[in-house]
């Protein structure tokens, strides 16, 4: 981080990770459960990094921020039948992909008596390359073999107004966001992905607060879904009129703040999902397939699945302990 003067500063941050997985086929405990796990898990090798910079300009009570970043995920999944690599005939999956995202975000924070206004926009260009060879053993066995080079331009706008009472007893936040991209006509209109949201907080007594929130959120399906092709090179999910995933969410709970660096909360939540990708191969929503290992979404889908989730979440947060932040949570769904 570098401070040019009292009005201008620049911060640069980066990190990376490597995941080099191997299957323990020589374990002594070859129970039925372990045999099943070894039979379906592929060998996964991943490399990822993110590099970004934040420029801030302070003008009185207002703050202007410009954020640029680049991230990349290199992913390789390989699987042989019975984990026997002695013959290429045993190869059932060879998946190699690269996801690269270049992001630019501009934001202004305007401060007024009793409320703050955040407005901004973002522009992003993503590239997704994929080389897939996969044998699918369904009712009719088939081989999937294709190559994808997908470029995707994304854009968005957002605004949030935050009000805080003079005695700091009541806080309200009202915001709206809109996102779009050039993947298809179903996704390129900002108004089709309009996301309003509202959150309220009221201090009941002492350090105990009642919090509530409600909002609509949109999420882009995974790149594996966007970039899936048939063996003739056609983007099947684009032809299937793929859309953003929609989620309506509401939450209500209590929060205890014994100090400026400690928070404990209990919140009940309800989430409703629409336009979720549904597999056309086995009629199972992608959300029900699990994402622990392997490739998710590398298949033909339609945006027709619905769902819901509700439960209780307990959270504890400890801020700025020797420069560190600790968060512990338990969720019952």
Identify what each model region corresponds to:
Residues 46-48, 73, 99-101, 152-154, ...:
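Membrane-spanning beta-strands of outer-membrane beta-barrel proteins
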């Amino acid at each position: 981080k570098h401070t040019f003067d009292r009005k201008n500063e620049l911060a640069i941050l980066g990190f990376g990770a490597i995941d080099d997985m191997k299957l323990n086929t020589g374990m002594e405990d070859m129970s039925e459960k372990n045999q099943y796990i070894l039979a379906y898990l592929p060998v996964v090798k991943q490399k990822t990094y993110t590099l970004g910079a934040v420029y801030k300009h302070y003008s009185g009570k207002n703050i202007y921020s410009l954020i640029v970043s680049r991230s990349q995920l290199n992913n390789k999944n390989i699987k042989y039948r019975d984990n026997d690599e002695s013959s290429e005939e045993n190869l059932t999956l060879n998946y190699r992909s690269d996801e690269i995202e270049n992001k630019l975000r501009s934001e202004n924070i305007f401060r007024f008596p009793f409320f703050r206004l955040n407005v901004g926009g973002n522009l992003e260009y993503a590239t997704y390359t994929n080389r897939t060879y996969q044998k699918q053993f369904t009712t009719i066995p088939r081989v999937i073999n294709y190559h994808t080079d997908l470029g995707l331009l994304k854009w968005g706008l957002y605004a949030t107004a935050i009000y805080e009472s003079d005695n700091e007893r009541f806080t309200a936040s009202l915001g709206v966001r809109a996102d779009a991209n050039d993947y298809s006509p179903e996704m390129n209109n900002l108004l089709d992905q309009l996301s309003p949201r509202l959150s309220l907080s009221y201090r009941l007594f002492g350090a105990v607060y009642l919090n509530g929130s409600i909002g609509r959120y949109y999420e882009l399906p995974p790149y594996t879904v966007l970039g899936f092709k048939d063996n003739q090179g056609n983007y099947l999910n684009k032809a299937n009129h793929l859309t953003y995933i929609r989620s309506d969410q509401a939450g209500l709970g209590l929060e205890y703040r014994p100090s400026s660096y400690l928070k404990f909360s209990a919140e009940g939540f309800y989430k409703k999902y629409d336009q979720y990708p549904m597999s056309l191969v086995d009629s199972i929503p992608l959300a029900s397939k699990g994402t622990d290992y392997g490739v998710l979404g590398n298949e033909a889908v339609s945006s027709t699945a619905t769902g819901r989730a509700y439960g209780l979440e307990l959270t504890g947060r400890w801020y700025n302990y020797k420069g560190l932040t600790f968060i512990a949570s338990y969720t019952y769904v």
